[in-house]
Amino acid sequence: MNPRQLEQMARQMQKEMMRIQEELANTTVEGTAGSYVTVTMNGHREIKSIKLAPEVVDPDDVETLQDLIVAAIADASKKAQELAEQRLGPLAGGMKLPGF
């Protein structure tokens, strides 16, 4: 492969990477903790919303609510990572990408 072909291939990969990054920013996943807490996050792991079931909001038991929120965030984060790995996987050639 000559240098010009390599450069063209690199530009093409960069363009595809940017397209996928934009797609991830516009794609959401949901993480849940039972039916009590739902966290919506985009493919970049940015939290977009948190929904709480009214019955889980108990001023006498804040710890349970905190645990449920942490669990829902962890679930959404795992799903966002899986989504990113799935979309970026072909470009990475099986390598683990930092931050994903």
From Swiss-Prot:
Keywords: Cytoplasm, DNA-binding. GO terms for molecular function: DNA binding. SUPFAM superfamilies: YbaB-like. It is found in: Cytoplasm, Nucleoid. Transmembrane segments: none annotated. Coiled coil: none annotated. Homodimer. This is Nucleoid-associated protein RoseRS_1534. It comes from Roseiflexus sp. (strain RS-1).
